[in-house]
């Protein structure tokens, strides 16, 4: 389900529980989209095609395409493999707390 579909559901008069669910789902979709954009930008800066990066991290090009489009549930393991393949640290933050995991 995409943002527009969720927004349409929110306008139909929903219970507080349904609204909370849709708000959480929108936040999850937004996070996946932002992560995908960051991966795409880093891949392009490295001069790699989707096919090349996908091969380096052991997934299909189509799976990487879904990740970059924000349409995949990205695991920390996959994210670590991406940053390792690009020679970049993985930075994770929760509120004011941030940790940088160096590339392998």
Where are these regions (language model features)?
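N-terminal flexible/basic segments that precede or flank functional cores
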Residues: 1-37, 99-104
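Short basic helix-loop element that most often maps to the first helix and adjoining turn
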Residues: 3-4, 9, 37-54, 81
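Recognition helix of helix-turn-helix/homeodomain-like DNA-binding domains
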Residues: 57-73
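DNA major-groove recognition helix of helix-turn-helix/homeodomain DNA-binding modules
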Residues: 77-93
């Amino acid at each position: 389900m995409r943002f527009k579909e969720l927004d349409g559901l929110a306008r139909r008069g929903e219970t507080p529980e349904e609204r909370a669910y849709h708000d959480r789902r929108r936040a999850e979709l937004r996070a996946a989209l932002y992560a995908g954009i960051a991966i795409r930008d880093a891949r392009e800066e490295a001069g790699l095609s989707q096919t090349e990066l996908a091969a380096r991290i052991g997934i299909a090009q189509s799976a990487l395409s879904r990740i970059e489009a924000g349409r995949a549930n990205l695991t920390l393991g996959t994210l670590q493999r991406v940053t390792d393949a690009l020679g970049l640290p993985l930075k994770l933050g929760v509120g004011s707390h941030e940790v940088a995991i160096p590339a392998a």
